[in-house]
From Swiss-Prot:
Keywords: Antiviral defense, ATP-binding, Helicase, Hydrolase, Nucleotide-binding. This is CRISPR-associated helicase Cas3. Belongs to the CRISPR-associated helicase Cas3 family. It comes from the Archaea. The keyword Nucleotide-binding applies. The keyword Cytoplasm does not apply. CRISPR (clustered regularly interspaced short palindromic repeat), is an adaptive immune system that provides protection against mobile genetic elements (viruses, transposable elements and conjugative plasmids). CRISPR clusters contain sequences complementary to antecedent mobile elements and target invading nucleic acids. CRISPR clusters are transcribed and processed into CRISPR RNA (crRNA). Cas3 plus Cascade participate in CRISPR interference, the third stage of CRISPR immunity. Probably unwinds dsDNA templates, thus providing substrates for CRISPR-associated endonuclease Cas3-HD.
Length: 614
């Protein structure tokens, strides 16, 4: 059986032309080492393009690499891919003649998940799905919770490593992309075969990742078998009233279509969910549910008529029959992903409504000359833009425009600085309310909250939204637009001095007992774990032993928890001790908040329907 017939047998589909090209190239690097970049629009079958050469080894018995390590940016994406790949493994085992019971048993052993809560942490499954942070610490022979020794490092060296959704590996200081670029360099030197997959990626990010000199595998115009998706109409509205929202949802449901509403923050998602849940079978999905509740919601997602979610649905989620997507304005790459959730199959028709920032009338009248909607409104030639923390205004964009002035017959370049903030910034909002907008420096502002996103990226994305439907289908146009959006972001991004305290460890792959200090400050995926528990205070008083169940944990952003920490009136830390009977868990009053710890909160702060309530 050749690889094409193998693919047909386990997927019931004909392969696309680009997938066959990818398999040929991946087969070569599995033997000799190297890099492959796959750049395909959403719903184009990238996963199969990357993993089929490895899976085919189970049939051909021609083993070039013994292990596949599949790296994703978030745990939710890992969880989504696990069953998909396990199902392929089950079909392979059935082809090889295993019984149904044995197929189930072996599939679980062959496909392993690794992101910090499992009993073993050695990267020793045939197929290992993991998050970027876990992969990085495994390579450095360290784990943030417990010991890992050097097993994962050895396992990685003998694997085909796939980095999926790499457009999501970004943060304010570009710390993660820089580390990935560093790791890629080391892995290439060790002849580890690497595959990178994305739908959209700025050119400068490719340079940081160290993959800019690789010709990407993509869909060619002359391909006869290629991914095709449905027709999507994109509308833009500056305001969507509750009545309009209700009417749009009812219309879509009456046509037998699903509705997907994507909000930028958890709080705004909950607010919209409460408004629309009576209109049909509704489901709320975001990052602040327990592992068990989130898994249940993801299982039920196909039954829901209305799905309200945050960024967790931007990538890796294959929703069928979505006829209406309503989304907040977001960075261009995220917006392309969101629109890509709609009408994913050939023959489907769908509608997307992008809700543009709502212009507050009072601000509009009183401060019209201070408002910036997008950079198109600023006439400049030479400009430098970066994010700074200004003592008067908080986090703002610093825009420096160079002008040429003539004085006494001589020309000289005169830089002028402007500060631009967004109305999500509490400091700026307070200044506006108190009518103290002029203070030391002129303050211009974006008339909407850009949280949780970089305001610089948001106002550049605002300038591109009218053409976003084109970018869904055309990779080249999408890349050119992303280069425009991220131009200043990358050009002006300065490497923080204390970054090197972490950099040196990973550059030399040194062992370390605790993460470098900058590592704890800079990583956006740094987390803590919350565990809702009934009568937690009583259990502490009575010194009860706690039966810890990983299904009830909620992994939250460390930075988010730091901002909310004082709002939890009762919080405790989980203590794990080992004796001859195994692990014993008890509680103590929580001290200073630290990343990667497990904190117990009262179950009054948690709802199965809406998640953490705070």
């Amino acid at each position: 059986m050749d690889i094409i017939n193998f693919f047909k047998q386990i997927t019931d589909h004909e392969p696309y032309d680009y997938q066959i090209r990818a398999w040929e190239k991946i087969n070569k690097i599995m033997e000799l080492g190297g890099r492959v970049v796959i750049e395909i629009p959403t719903a184009g079958g990238k996963t199969e393009a990357a993993i089929i050469p490895y899976l085919y080894q189970f049939i051909s018995n021609d083993w070039k690499v013994p292990r596949l390590i599949y790296v994703l940016p978030t745990r939710s994406l890992v969880e989504k891919q696990v069953e998909r790949i396990r199902n392929y493994i089950k079909k392979i085992l059935e082809i090889k003649g295993y019984s149904k019971d044995k197929v189930e048993e072996l599939a679980k052993k062959i496909v392993q998940v690794e992101y910090g809560l499992e009993e073993t942490h050695a990267f020793l499954g045939f197929v290992v799905l993991t998050t970027w942070d876990t992969f990085l610490y495994g390579l450095a022979a360290h784990r943030t919770v417990g010991d890992r020794f050097t097993f994962p490092c050895g396992a990685i060296a003998q694997s085909l490593v796939v980095f999926d959704e790499i457009q999501m590996y970004q943060d304010e200081s570009l710390y993660m992309p820089r580390l990935i670029g560093l790791v890629v360099k080391r892995l290439v030197e060790a002849n580890v075969p690497l595959v990178f997959m994305t739908a959209t990626l700025p050119t400068e990010l490719k340079k940081i990742l160290g993959i800019h000199d690789e010709e990407p595998i993509t869909v060619n115009p002359e391909d006869t078998k290629k991914p095709e998706r449905g027709e999507v109409v994109v509308e833009f509205k500056e305001k969507l009233s509750d009545e309009e929202l209700s009417n749009e949802i009812k219309k879509a449901i009456n046509e037998g279509k699903k509705v997907l509403i994507i909000k930028n923050t958890v709080n705004s998602a909950i607010e919209v969910y409460e408004k629309v849940k009576q209109l049909g079978n509704s489901l709320l999905l975001h990052s602040r549910f327990t592992v068990e509740d989130r898994a249940e919601k993801e299982k039920d997602i196909d039954k829901a008529e209305i799905i309200v979610a945050t960024q967790v649905v931007e990538a890796g989620l294959d929703l069928t029959n979505v006829g209406l997507v309503i989304t907040d304005l977001a960075p261009l790459d995220a917006l392309i992903q969101r629109i890509g959730r709609c009408a994913r199959r050939k023959g489907e028709r769908g509608k997307v409504i992008v809700v543009l920032p709502n212009f507050n009338e009072k601000i509009n009248e009183d401060h019209r000359e201070k408002v910036i909607l997008g950079f198109k409104n600023i006439p400049f030639e030479n400009a430098y833009v970066t994010l700074v923390n200004n003592k008067d205004y908080g986090r703002v964009i610093e825009l420096t425009i160079e002008t040429i002035e003539e004085k006494k017959g001589k020309s000289k370049i005169v830089p002028k600085k402007f500060y631009i903030g967004d109305l999500g910034n509490k400091t700026i909002r307070k200044l506006i309310e108190n009518n103290k907008i002029l203070k030391k420096k002129d303050l211009y502002f974006i008339p909407y909250s850009t949280q949780p996103y970089d305001p610089l990226i948001m106002i550049k994305s605002f300038d591109e939204v009218e053409s976003v439907s084109e970018y869904l289908y055309d990779i080249i146009k999408a890349r050119e637009a992303l280069d425009r959006v991220y131009k200043e972001y990358y050009e002006n991004n300065i490497v923080p001095k204390d970054y090197y305290s972490a950099y040196i460890y990973f550059r030399e792959l040194k062992l370390f007992s605790t993460p470098p200090e900058y590592e704890l400050k800079a990583r956006p995926e740094m987390f803590a774990i919350l565990y809702p528990l009934e009568n937690a205070e009583e259990k502490v008083k009575n010194k009860e032993i706690i039966e810890f169940n990983p299904k009830y944990v909620i992994r939250v952003s460390y930075n988010w928890l730091k901002n909310k920490w004082e709002k939890f009136d009762k919080k405790f830390e989980l203590i794990k001790e080992y004796d001859e009977k195994g692990w014993i868990c008890s509680l103590k009053k929580a001290g200073k908040l630290q990343p990667y710890k497990i904190y117990i909160i009262d179950d009054k702060y948690y709802s199965k329907e809406t998640g953490i309530i705070i």
